[in-house]
């Protein structure tokens, strides 16, 4: 059970990191009005 919970936590963290990276890439490619980011 512990191993399962750990694997689940890992998978969740991976999915979250992926989603975050996707959202960041999207924001960088198409910044909303007033967005201050890497592109300034």
UniProtKB/Swiss-Prot annotation:
Which keywords are on file for this protein?
Answer: Amidation, Secreted, Signal
Where is the signal peptide, in residue numbers? 1-3
Q: Which residues form the propeptide?
A: 4-29
State the disulfide connectivity: none
Keyword match Signal: yes
UniProt keyword tRNA processing present:
no
Q: In which tissues is it expressed?
A: Expressed by the venom gland.
Location in the cell reads: Secreted
Q: Which GO terms describe its cellular component?
A: extracellular region
Residues the record lists as Arginine amide modifications: 39
Domain of life where this protein originates: Eukaryota
Q: What does this protein do?
A: Venom protein with unknown function. Does not induce paralysis when a high dose is administered by intrathoracic injection into the blowfly Lucilia caesar.
Q: What's the family?
A: Belongs to the formicidae venom precursor-01 superfamily.
What's the further remark here? Is very weakly abundant (1.81%).
**Which named protein is this?**
U2-myrmicitoxin-Tb1a
Q: Provide the species name.
A: Tetramorium bicarinatum (Tramp ant)
């Amino acid at each position: 059970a512990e191993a399962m919970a750990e694997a689940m936590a890992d998978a969740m963290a991976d999915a979250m990191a992926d989603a975050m990276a996707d959202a960041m890439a999207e924001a960088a490619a198409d910044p909303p009005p007033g967005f201050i980011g890497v592109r300034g």
